[in-house]
Each structure stands twice: as structure tokens, then as C-alpha cells.
Amino acid sequence: MTYSVSPSSLLTEYGNDNICRVLALDGGGAKGFYTLGVLKEIEAMLGCPLYKRFDLVFGTSTGAIIAALIALGYEVDQIHALYTEHVPRVMSSRSAAARTMALQDLAKEVFQDKTFEDVLMGIGIVATRWMTERPMIFKGNVVQAHGRKGTFSPGFGVSIADAVQASCSAYPFFERKVIVTAAGDKVELIDGGYCANNPTLFAIADATVALKKDHKDIRVINVGVGIYPEPKPGLLMRIAKKWLAVQLLQKTLEINTQSMDQLRDILFKDIPTIRISDTFERPEMATDLLEYNLDKLNTLRQRGRESFGAREAQLREFLI
């Protein structure tokens, strides 16, 4: 199937007011349905595709998929349709090799031959270098570079499909992703959540250092995936080591997320920021990053829309 951006019915236009609006999207696997619920309401409030109102979009893992599609001009309903079609197939696969193949097929089918030269806004896709244990952030414009501008290549010369797959490669549940840069360097990558499951700090670094925006002229919207009870393991999952590994991965990513947000609050308290990622404690909300039940995923999306409602007035002040 060929995917393309449909003509938009969202026609509101905004003038340039010198405010740098930043959208940062957390990782969290299938729980990205919550993110889509929040973004659907933001898009409807704005009356225009998100790329037309935000200057920068950064994403990690599931947030990287959404960020890349936003930057290519997709509207939220189109992204939701893609998630509904593909996420259950990827997450229901029974092995790392099968999940990796399903993720690779998804990335190639959706992004095709798109490169970082095709994006319509500033973008950052966060992955983690396996060997050197450092972040690798794929960007589209040399103005976002913090150095080595003379050799800058959009997205390091890597396709969007490969960059997004790397950002989503939650090892050991997915295999590591090997990419080859425009310089001919072979790099082995894993999920960006291992270094910045919440990519807000990297986005603020671009806005303040690379783009040289004053703190007072920046507005940050950081959308998480929500916090949920752990699902009760079935008999087979109790026996298998997989259940403990899922718990450990989720805990690692959540600690990373909260640490990055706390650090952001300390270092950049003067930059107006709204974080949306509510906690849901009812037992029926139990889920994890490998969820593939569409009824449960639709419930997460509904919760995301409700989370928007609790902050609508502040979001309107930031964005309109």
C-alpha cells in the first residue's frame, strides 16, 4: 500500500509572532495512542496541521514515528489510522526478530524513500549508539547543528525509515539497527529511550543554542504516553523471563523520562512548558509498551483527549 499526505481541510493560518513553539514527544511503544489523543485535540484547537504551528518537533521511539509523520505534513487522524493498522501486527509478534521485521516493513511501507530533506519543519529523531553509549539525533536542517556544520548532512544521510526504526529498536525486544551514514560510517543503534525517553532537553538545546532563541520567546509542549498499572502476567508470562524483562524496560524508560523532566525544570524553569502525561490508577487501565489490543489502545487515545481538556486554556494561551 502507498501512503501519502491527503489535502488538508484544516485551513487556519497564523502570522509570525517570533515565538518558537516546540513539540516534544516521549517514547512508550504502543502507548503512543495516548499521545495521538492529546495531539488530535491540539490540532483541532489550532485548526491547522501541526507542522504549520510548531517550529520544532522532537520524538523518541513511538514519539519518533509521530514526529516524523507530523514533519512530513500528516494530520493526526492519518497517523492514527496508520497506528491502528500497523501497531497490533508489530507488537503481537512473538520474537525480537519477528517484531524487528514487522517494524522494518512498517517503516519502509509508510516512509518509503523519504529523507530528512523532505521535512517541513525542524525535527529531531533520538536514537542511542550501542557501542559508544551516546545519543545520535537525526536532524533535517544545518541550522540545528551544534558543530561540524561543514560536513552536516540532513539525517546523517540516512532515510527517515531507517532513523525511525533505529529510534524504536527497544532492545532486547527488537534487534539492534545498523545504519550507514553519508560519510560511510556504520553505526549500530538502539531505542532512543535508553538515553532520552523524554526528548525535551534536546529540543530546548536546539531552540536556545542552535537557533539562539531567548528563553522568553520559547513555548514547549511535551506530550508523554501516560502512566498505567502493570498488567497481571498470565501463567506463561510468569514462567518466561520476558515478563520481568518488560517490567525492567518499562521501569528504565519511566525513570529516564522523569529524570529528564526534573532536569528540565531545574535548568530551564524560565522557559514556559506544559507537560501532558497523566497517571491512571484504575486496574482496567493496566497496560505496557507491547500492548496490541485495539480496544485497550483506543481507551488510551480517549484518555489522551481528556488530558488535553484539563489543560486546554493554558494550551490555547501557548499556541494561539
UniProtKB/Swiss-Prot annotation:
The PNPLA domain, residue ranges: 23-204
Motif stretch (GXSXG): 59-63
Entry's Gene Ontology molecular function annotations: phospholipase A1 activity
Motif DGA/G per UniProt: ranges: 191-193
Motif GXGXXG: chain residues: 27-32
Any Pfam family the entry gives: Patatin
Key word Hydrolase present: yes
Activity regulation: Phospholipase activity is specifically activated upon 3',3'-cUAMP binding. Is not activated by the other cyclic dinucleotides 3',3'-cGAMP, 3',3'-c-diAMP and 3',3'-c-diGMP. Therefore, is specifically activated by only the nucleotide synthesized from its adjacently encoded nucleotidyltransferase (CdnE).
PROSITE patterns on file: PNPLA (PS51635)
Gene3D superfamilies (alphabetical): Cytosolic phospholipase A2 catalytic domain
EC number, as in UniProt: 3.1.1.32
BP-aspect Gene Ontology terms: defense response to virus; fatty acid metabolic process; lipid catabolic process
Residues at the active site: S61, D191
CC annotations in GO: membrane
Reaction equation(s) it catalyzes: a 1,2-diacyl-sn-glycero-3-phosphocholine + H2O = a 2-acyl-sn-glycero-3-phosphocholine + a fatty acid + H(+)
Keyword Lipid metabolism: yes
Domain of life: Bacteria
The family this protein is said to belong to: Belongs to the patatin family.
Protein role: Effector phospholipase of a CBASS antivirus system. CBASS (cyclic oligonucleotide-based antiphage signaling system) provides immunity against bacteriophage. The CD-NTase protein synthesizes cyclic nucleotides in response to infection; these serve as specific second messenger signals. The signals activate a diverse range of effectors, leading to bacterial cell death and thus abortive phage infection. A type II-A(UA) CBASS system. Phospholipase that is activated upon binding to the cyclic dinucleotide (CDN) second messenger 3',3'-cyclic UMP-AMP (3',3'-cUAMP).
UniProt miscellaneous comment: This is a complex CBASS locus with the loci capE-cdnE-probable diadenylate cyclase-capV-dcnV1-cap2-cap3.
Designated name of the protein: cUMP-AMP-activated phospholipase
Naturally occurring in which organism (per UniProt): Escherichia coli
